[in-house]
Amino acid sequence: MIAMRIYQVIISFEVLSELEAMAKYIASIYRPESGHNYVNRVLGQLAALSYSADAYQHSRFALAKAIHPKAKTISIINHKWTVVFHIDGDFVIVDKIIPSKSMH
């Protein structure tokens, strides 16, 4: 049996600020709870990196590599967002969330 590595996920302050702005924007268009629900979905997918981070290869995108030389990427929320993260020891560090269309 292969032991699965579990990481602690750390979200950068920049990403937290982006998520807060995202929640406020969605709440201004729809309902306040819509913004919170959306961000909670994002946070749930980020939390899943604690056990899935090793499954992703280093990114081939120049934008991701510019953020961190050992960046990995994952698409979330119906491929609308790309999460740029890297692994450092026992930690998965979420560096940035970018609209997926800007990655290509």
Feature map (PLM): residue ranges:
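Arg/Lys-rich, positively charged N-terminal/basic patches that mediate binding to nucleic acids
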Residues: 1-45
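Enriched for short, Lys/Arg-rich terminal
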Residues: 2, 74-104
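A broad, structure-centric signal for solvent-exposed, well-ordered loop/edge residues
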Residues: 18, 33, 56, 83, ...
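Residue-level signal for well-ordered alpha-helical positions
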Residues: 22, 52, 97-98
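General N-terminal targeting signals
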Residues: 26-28, 39, 43, 66, ...
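A short, surface-exposed loop/turn module that caps and links secondary-structure elements
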Residues: 47-76
